[in-house]
Design a protein with these regions (language model features):
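Glycine-rich phosphate-binding loop
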Residues: 47-83
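Active-site rim loops that border cofactor/substrate pockets in soluble metabolic enzymes
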Residues: 26-54
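Glycine-rich phosphate/diphosphate-binding loop of Rossmann-like nucleotide-binding domains
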Residues: 3-36
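Short, ordered loop/turn segments at secondary-structure junctions
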Residues: 12-13, 64-65, 100-103
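Amphipathic, non-transmembrane alpha-helical secondary structure
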Residues: 23, 43-50, 113-116, 120-123
Length: 128
């Protein structure tokens, strides 16, 4: 695991929540080299992973999508999840999905530890 490199791509749209996701994700990566790239929103995460797919052994996608009054929530969460899954399967590299989708801010704040779960998933696959 020493020589493995992981890229964390973190959406800044809800910055306070993203910071929490990052903190929990990085707390699990003490034995792995990692870099964090910050992007404006969840929709930009897949393209940044795609651009870096050959440089890293694994990836962690972090961000928050909160349901509003329009169907935008459904489009963004579905499209980003689909793109991340396709990238992972096509590249045969693990991508921990730490993008949380919530109905309100209270739910989002309660799920800040999901970054750690995404990191642990990547570590688990990399160690196989």
């Amino acid at each position: 695991m020493k020589n493995k490199k992981v890229l964390i791509v973190s959406a800044r749209y809800y910055e306070e929540l993203s910071n929490s996701l990052e903190l929990y994700a990085t707390s699990s990566l003490s034995k792995i080299k990692y870099k964090i790239i910050k992007v404006p929103g969840v929709f930009e995460i897949p393209v940044v992973i795609s651009k870096n797919i050959k440089k890293y052994d694994g990836f962690i996608a972090l961000g928050v999508v909160i349901k509003g009054e329009t169907p935008h929530f459904d489009f963004i969460s579905s499209a980003s999840t689909q793109a991340i899954m396709s990238l992972s399967v096509d590249s045969k590299k693990p991508i921990g999905n730490g993008i949380i989708t919530c109905l309100n801010m209270k739910q989002a704040k309660a799920r800040g530890k999901k970054g750690k779960e995404a990191a642990k998933a990547v570590i688990s696959v990399l160690s196989q």
